[in-house]
């Protein structure tokens, strides 16, 4: 009985921790949002910033991206995340803005996905009541150009990046893990975008330096080989005849 009470007390305490984390997130959002707005204005001056960031994100993003997706994502101009609900700061609005392209109608270059937190009560294996947190959303109506829709046409095919905009989180057979992608975009990729970009640029510069060093080494080896060949080809000097 004492053990059961202890587990119940721990469960209640975990709920209090959860409430505290939400209060921290509220304060963090209050402080960060003006800074993110300033950053957005600065990033407009850096070509392909978000394209580089997505490439640097690795499997967290690339697992969803098909070759066709990547063609459109090359036109990505901006990603922005807003926590629009003061009472529930985990609710997010994720916006992706594109340059004019062959896929999207010109009146629909910004795709907006709102994701909300939904808490439901359930019981665990021991019969104790607990709260389950779900991420839910509404499908986004994307205006594709004729014949250019990137939504998968068959549910048997693996999901791709743009299927995220059709994900709802409500269907039990939904095979797209939109909750995980939402958390990654909102809590990792967006706030740490400059870090991803800087690391990618540093790695690229390092690769270029290594390439230059390798080319210089090859040039030096070629020069040494040429000098060696010249020495081998040089004829021996003739001895002068003695006069009688």
From Swiss-Prot:
It comes from the Eukaryota. The modification Phosphoserine is found at residue 211. One of its GO terms (molecular function) is histone chaperone activity. The keyword Nucleus applies. Keywords: Nucleus, Phosphoprotein. Disulfide bonds: none annotated. Residues 201-232 have a biased composition (Acidic residues). One of its GO terms (biological process) is nucleosome assembly. It holds the Pfam family NAP. This is Putative nucleosome assembly protein C36B7.08c.
């Amino acid at each position: 009985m004492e053990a059961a009470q202890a587990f119940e007390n721990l469960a209640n305490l975990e709920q209090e921790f959860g409430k505290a984390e939400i209060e921290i997130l509220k304060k963090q959002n209050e402080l960060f949002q003006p800074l993110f707005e300033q950053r957005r204005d600065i990033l407009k001056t850096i070509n392909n910033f978000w394209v580089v960031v997505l490439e640097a994100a690795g499997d967290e993003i690339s697992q969803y991206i098909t070759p066709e997706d990547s063609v459109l994502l090359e036109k990505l101009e901006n990603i922005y995340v807003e926590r629009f609900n003061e009472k529930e700061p985990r609710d997010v609005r994720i916006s992706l803005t594109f340059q004019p392209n062959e896929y999207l109608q010109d009146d629909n270059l910004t795709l907006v996905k709102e994701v909300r937190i939904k808490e439901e009560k359930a019981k665990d294996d021991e019969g104790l009541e607990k709260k389950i947190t779900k991420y839910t959303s509404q499908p986004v109506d994307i205006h594709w150009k004729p014949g250019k829709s990137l939504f998968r046409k068959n549910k048997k095919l693996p999901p791709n990046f743009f299927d995220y905009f059709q994900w709802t989180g409500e269907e039990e057979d939904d095979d797209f893990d939109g909750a995980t992608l939402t958390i990654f975009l909102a809590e990792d990729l967006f706030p740490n975008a400059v870090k991803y970009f800087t690391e990618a640029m540093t790695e690229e510069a390092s690769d270029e330096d290594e390439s230059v060093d390798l080319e210089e080494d090859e040039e030096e080896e070629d020069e040494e080989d040429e000098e060696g060949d010249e020495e081998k080809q040089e004829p021996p000097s003739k001895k002068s005849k003695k006069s009688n």
